[in-house]
Amino acid sequence: MVKKVNNPLKIDYQNGIIENRLLQIRNFKDVNTPKLINVWSIRIDPRDSKKVIELIRNDFQKNDPVSLRHLKRIRKDIETSTLEVVLCSKEYICDEGEINNKLKSIWVGTKKYELSDDIEVPEFAPSTKELNNAWSVKYWPLIWNGNPNDQILNDYKIDMQEVRNELSRASTLSVKMATAGKQFPMVSVFVDPSRKKDKVVAEDGRNCENSLPIDHSVMVGIRAVGERLREGVDEDANSYLCLDYDVYLTHEPCSMCSMALIHSRVRRVVFLTEMQRTGSLKLTSGDGYCMNDNKQLNSTYEAFQWIGEEYPVGQVDRDVCC
């Protein structure tokens, strides 16, 4: 984890902009709507707290797939003079017997405690201190460490020169296609970070005769990656077609292409031109799906829009799905 002051990238944390060019695309509409999860909690005598905290540190905190670092683990019950402690998420352990076995392992003899799995807590911290205080009262006491998105921005690893090179590649081809009179000057560049020289550059297939309406540049690119796998070009094949790929687009993708990128498990998408009527990444585009960061889906990917004017693209009708 790099400290903000040591980050080589210039980041505007308030507006989510990196190096004055990459605008972070996230579903900020839902970020302050708590996604509640069930956790295991235990009510104990304060004298037993040391052993329980040791169990949390040595087991639950290390192995729980859900980070609960934004929670205060302990809250006091003044009326009963007991402590209520959050142990772990039910995603980590769903069986009550397993929890009891772990608790029994830290005590000699029989101990009385109340175990519960009906406590609901926010899975993620809110973006403001005011909401943090409100959720602490309504759900469970939280720790305020600042806006969580600041850390997300700070953790991005981005080679700006590589981004420029690939966007320039896509832009040049798109302009060339438009100059040649092609109706769909959309371009996608698929880059496997582990094989950067062996990239896939895909033009929109709808410019060709006998094409299908779904032959968008993204779909053509994914298909090309699949063909390489089938032909044995990529020997280290994964179960997902484009696992951890970086994808560079001339135009904001439509819902079909955005979902195809979800299914392909790409890592990052960078696009040049937003499509206000048909796009599916920005909250202000299309129906506001924000497909890359939608809580209803089981996967996400990073998304950015290049907000500089260095890389022109071929223009398309605003109702065209890209």
Swiss-Prot record:
CDD domains: nucleoside_deaminase (cd01285)
Pfam families: dCMP_cyt_deam_1
Domain (CMP/dCMP-type deaminase) ranges: 162-283
Keyword line: Cytoplasm, Nucleus, Peroxisome, tRNA processing
GO MF, one annotated term: tRNA-specific adenosine deaminase activity
GO biological process, one term: tRNA wobble adenosine to inosine editing
Binding residues for Zn(2+): H216, C254, C257, C322
Record-linked SUPFAM superfamilies: Cytidine deaminase-like (SSF53927)
Subcellular localization(s) per the UniProt record: Cytoplasm; Nucleus; Peroxisome
Entry GO terms, CC: cytoplasm; nucleus; peroxisome; tRNA-specific adenosine-34 deaminase complex
Record InterPro entries: CMP_dCMP_dom, Cytidine_deaminase-like
Quaternary state and interactors: Heterodimer with TAD2.
Miscellaneous comment: Present with 892 molecules/cell in log phase SD medium.
Role, per record: Structural subunit of tRNA-specific adenosine deaminase, which deaminates adenosine-34 (the first, also called wobble position of the anticodon) to inosine in many tRNAs. Inosine-34 allows the decoding of 3 different nucleotides at the third position of mRNA codons, as inosine is able to pair with U, C, and A.
Entry's family note: Belongs to the cytidine and deoxycytidylate deaminase family. ADAT3 subfamily.
This protein's name: tRNA-specific adenosine deaminase subunit TAD3
Protein source organism: Saccharomyces cerevisiae (strain ATCC 204508 / S288c)
Lineage of producing organism: Eukaryota, Fungi, Dikarya, Ascomycota, Saccharomycotina
